[in-house]
Design a protein with these regions (language model features):
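Ser/Thr/Pro/Gly-rich low-complexity linker/stalk segments immediately outside membranes or between
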Residues: 56-73
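Helical hinge/lid and interdomain linker segments adjacent to catalytic or ligand-binding clefts
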Residues: 177-253
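N-terminal Sec-pathway targeting helices
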Residues: 29-44, 54
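Aromatic-Pro/Gly-enriched surface loop or interdomain linker
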Residues: 69-209, 284-288, 292-330
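Transmembrane alpha-helices
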Residues: 45-51, 137-140
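N-terminal Lys/Arg-rich, disordered targeting/topogenic segments
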Residues: 1-33
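A glycine-rich, often tryptophan-bearing local segment used as a flexible ligand/cofactor-contacting loop or short
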Residues: 223-306
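Intrinsic-disorder/low-complexity accessory segments
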Residues: 75, 94, 141-146, 220-221, ...
């Protein structure tokens, strides 16, 4: 009887132990399932977060990429809308148009426009002469948007003249450039009318490699440029400087609000003044010709990577298209 009881006891103990083991396995399995579920949930949350970030990034990139850069055509269209008042000229090549304010000033005896001029070819001008001046393939002109901004008031030149502090060289808007004498307004319009391809400072600064598409790059009075723009232009193998004083001073730009700030050059900064902000030998060599306005002995001088005109032609180019004819032959 004792042996039988012991046997039953062992059997009961074994069943109890097996039940405990099974319960333990079941509990472990439930615990593991919970851990797995938690991990899956965390991974799902992370995945959703990453996906949302990617969508946001793509959205921002899309907005940025679709933000168009104003072109020369845009600027000329604006000029056509603002300069609508015709004034007669003895010049048989171009017709001139002014803004209303300048037109009023003109008839009050002040012929010097504040807002620049718009020019178009006179209908009587020889068509063949225009065709002869059409650009060579692979040529582009860079319109000096930044320089136009620098010469506005209040601006850089108010600072140089001691009329204001460094706020006049800091965060200056470069929107709405003007076709003035100081920004090669007439030269730019003539080249545009002749069919030259145009980029602006902004195009080159944002995408310096764009100049590699062109065989020849023509500079106007691109006095103020960024370091990226300077590097892209100065390293191009075939430049034509239609104006002295190009690539003279370094600026920084902020495309969030379309402003620019003077960094170096034009005897700035005051604690370490320098003339050419880039130490650019070609500009330094031809700098004195900036004030040669009559261009009586004009010529294109060969430089290591192109040619440089030895005068500032803005005053006379509307009457002397021979300069552009010679430029085309270079």
């Amino acid at each position: 009887m004792v042996k039988k009881n012991n046997s039953n006891k062992k059997t009961n103990n074994k069943k109890t132990n097996n039940k405990k083991t099974n319960n333990k396995k079941t509990n472990n399995k439930k615990t593991n399932n919970k851990k797995t579920a938690i991990i899956v949930i965390i991974c799902a949350i992370i995945s959703v977060f990453v996906f949302a970030m990617m969508l946001t990034s793509n959205s921002e990139t899309s907005v940025s990429s679709t933000k168009t850069i104003p072109t020369m055509s845009d600027y000329v269209d604006n000029l056509s809308n603002s300069h609508t008042y015709f004034i007669p000229q003895t010049n048989s090549i171009f017709d001139h148009f002014l803004t209303y304010n300048d037109f009023t000033r003109y008839h009050n005896g002040n012929p010097s426009p504040n807002d620049g001029i718009r020019i178009t070819f006179n209908e009587s001008y020889d068509t063949q002469s225009i065709l002869d001046l059409k650009p060579n393939d692979g040529t582009v002109v860079i319109y000096p948007v930044f320089t136009s901004a620098a010469y506005k008031t209040p601006g850089f030149y108010d600072y140089y003249a001691g009329k204001c502090d460094e706020t006049c060289v800091t965060d200056i808007s470069f929107e709405n450039p003007e076709f003035q004498f100081t920004s090669s307004g007439a030269s730019a319009q003539i080249l545009y009318l002749l069919g030259y391809d145009f980029l602006t400072d902004i195009h080159v600064d944002k995408n310096p490699e764009i100049l590699e598409k062109y065989d020849t790059v023509i500079l106007l009075h691109n006095e103020y440029v960024t370091k990226k723009e300077f590097d892209a232009i100065s390293n191009h193998p075939n430049l034509i400087f239609l104006n002295p004083n190009a690539l003279y001073a370094e600026i920084d730009v902020n495309y969030d609000d379309n402003t620019m700030t003077l960094i170096r050059g034009h005897d700035y900064p005051p604690e370490n003044p320098v003339a050419n902000g880039f130490g650019y030998a070609i500009e330094e060599k031809f700098h004195e010709y900036e004030y040669e306005l009559e261009c009586l002995d004009w010529k294109f001088v060969e430089i290591e990577n192109g040619f440089h005109l030895n005068c500032y032609p803005e005053s006379i180019i509307v009457n002397n298209l021979e300069i552009l004819k010679k430029m085309k032959e270079l």
